[in-house]
Amino acid sequence: AQLVDSMPSASTGSVVVTDDLNYWGGRRIKSKDGATTEPVFEPATGRVLCQMVPCGAEEVDQAVQSAQAAYLKWSKMAGIERSRVMLEAARIIRERRDNIAKLEVINNGKTITEAEYDIDAAWQCIEYYAGLAPTLSGQHIQLPGGAFAYTRREPLGVCAGILAWNYPFMIAAWKCAPALACGNAVVFKPSPMTPVTGVILAEIFHEAGVPVGLVNVVQGGAETGSLLCHHPNVAKVSFTGSVPTGKKVMEMSAKTVKHVTLELGGKSPLLIFKDCELENAVRGALMANFLTQGQVCTNGTRVFVQREIMPQFLEEVVKRTKAIVVGDPLLTETRMGGLISKPQLDKVLGFVAQAKKEGARVLCGGEPLTPSDPKLKNGYFMSPCVLDNCRDDMTCVKEEIFGPVMSVLPFDTEEEVLQRANNTTFGLASGVFTRDISRAHRVAANLEAGTCYINTYSISPVEVPFGGYKMSGFGRENGQATVDYYSQLKTVIVEMGDVDSLF
């Protein structure tokens, strides 16, 4: 809380985090049995923000034990009692929203405008599931002869969350809120690149009144995540991240037959038809590619534009992309900050170089950028990039770049573009811009993706389910559907008469 309270006077390049970043048993704890210390960098300056010490096996076990003990109390509470505590947590986040958002910016690199939206989305998620908690119930089924059955919706136990670095606080809330609403306990592991804000969420839940040890945080990388996946007392793992890591999580969790939710990568198509409202389509394409420096799993990075409107579309998109203000993420006029790390920046720039080799044309951006402010000279900035002259077989069109790079491709017919849009192993999101209501719903029905946007893009309301098709994962986050992934159904069969026996 002291770190959060100091945020009003904080500026880019001024914050050093010395607090312990693990949390179990209702308090912050310093790692002792992790292998090595890893530096955590501030994306805007390239400066070391803090040191992350990963948790080892003994510490992960302590966190799980803490969760197990609290689960015995929380799972016995009525839904309305759980709801009151969760609503108080949402209120505290709302109250501290501005300060948490500033710390999120310093750790993650996204702009303050986006971070404020993320923190709002976090408390809204908790508030939503607080409302859902008292409604969770089973079903009564009448059977012949006066017998009957009923179902009980019961929690799973200890749920583990393995988080991504692009939305550290919000994704932590997405994992915790439905789990807690259903009566579970939680142990989550933030990304080693963004370890700072997740622990604040755990503190807030305890301040709000959850049983001590209900929400726990273990820091670390792949080894710590592996310990959670293999732990015999973890009932479920929810993972957000890349496809290769998701496969490993699934494989490790299978050894103890855990419930698994995977929210993985994407290479989402955005289809822009000639009858669209061009202004909205341009706005949608920019939102689909440049939020959070392009580091968003749902990004519509394959922008298919009907040939007749390609010149007008490119002219407007390039003009607006060039006008994007890149710089200090804590300034309200900034629209793009630094990428998460130097390796990520180099990787994205490498994709642009490869695209040029394969014949794509860079219409703007795609280069390292040094803002005028001297304190930002070592930050991980690049200019947002628009590529045209792209083909479906190019690396930039097939692989997830995870940076501010838009690939634009022409198409002629609806049938053709649907076939091309679905020709991918991913299936997280998709979008269509058209004024033809029949086409809009026809295209949405035929796109192979967990989410399809019609005449919009890049919104994820907590009320609606979110998740992927194909290799973008399975399970759902947000919405009522998530209850099915954080609970289990018990069937109880009751005979009111004599037992009908063959013996």
From Swiss-Prot:
Coiled coil: none annotated. The keyword Protease does not apply. Its EC number is 1.2.1.47, 1.2.1.3. The record marks N166 as: Transition state stabilizer. GO terms for biological process: carnitine biosynthetic process. It catalyses: 4-(trimethylamino)butanal + NAD(+) + H2O = 4-(trimethylamino)butanoate + NADH + 2 H(+); an aldehyde + NAD(+) + H2O = a carboxylate + NADH + 2 H(+). NAD(+) binds at K189, G241, S242, V243, P244, T245, E400. The keyword NADP does not apply. The active site is at E263 (proton acceptor), C297 (nucleophile). Its main location: cytoplasm. Keywords: Cytoplasm, NAD, Oxidoreductase. GO terms for molecular function: 4-trimethylammoniobutyraldehyde dehydrogenase activity; aldehyde dehydrogenase (NAD+) activity. It is an enzyme of class 1 (oxidoreductase). One of its GO terms (cellular component) is cytosol. Pathway: Amine and polyamine biosynthesis; carnitine biosynthesis. It is found in: Cytoplasm, Cytosol. InterPro entries: Ald_DH/histidinol_DH (IPR016161), Ald_DH_C (IPR016163), Ald_DH_CS_CYS (IPR016160), Ald_DH_CS_GLU (IPR029510), Ald_DH_N (IPR016162), Aldehyde_DH_dom (IPR015590). Belongs to the aldehyde dehydrogenase family. Converts gamma-trimethylaminobutyraldehyde into gamma-butyrobetaine with high efficiency (in vitro). Can catalyze the irreversible oxidation of a broad range of aldehydes to the corresponding acids in an NAD-dependent reaction, but with low efficiency. Homotetramer. PANTHER family: ALDEHYDE DEHYDROGENASE-RELATED (PTHR11699). This is 4-trimethylaminobutyraldehyde dehydrogenase. The gene is aldh9A1.
